[in-house]
Each structure stands twice: as C-alpha cells, then as structure tokens.
C-alpha cells in the first residue's frame, strides 16, 4: 500500500458504477488514462484524471467480488500504483485478482499469538492454499492487543 485516497463520488447504476477518488498531492503525478491502480487491492483502470482526482469504472464482476460496491462518499481506500522498473520491492508480494470477500468468523487468542479464521465460500476453498498470502482491508484499528 502506498497511501490512502478519499472517495469524492460513487455513481452506482444497475451492474455498473463509477468511483471518483481524491489522492494525496503528487501521488498520482505522471499517471495517464488507461493506467492501472490497485484500489483496496483491486486492479482498476483510470478512466479520467483531474489533477490528483482519478475516476474508475467498476463492472458488475468487480462490484460482486470486492468490497468496492459498499463504498460511499468520504470512504477511505488503500491505493498502490503499478510497480515500475527500478522501484524497491519490499515486504511480501501478493499477486493475482480479487475473486471474493471473506468475513472473519473467529479469532483465537493465545498468550503469544492470534489465529484469524475467515469464512470463504465453499466453492472457492479448493483455491485456498495453506500458508498462502491474502490481502486484507480492515477499518482502523487494524490490529488490537
């Protein structure tokens, strides 16, 4: 994640929506219509740019499989621009596309650890790998003692 942006408008129509968000000053410098930006972990294509404000069209599959359809004006979203040659690649990479959302069904607390259990649709369980990585979008505080 490179930063947070604020939703300035969300125009929802049947099976389609347009998301407009204000990005921190200078954070989208040099970006062009057609560029890819990850918003809440979802790869979106820039359809319009007005300074530090970008627009994205969300198709029915994006609305179904992600949490983007639940956003409203003033919602905050995580964003990350596409990697470029020469950029530092730090941390752990997560690659792929968003196929669903999951709810936390249980949190097991031990003296030295926490195990978070997610409820995933049964039809997708065959794609869930032990010790694989998943991306999480959570309201603050992200983690609590």
Show where each model-derived region lies.
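Conserved loop->alpha-helix
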Residues: 1-145
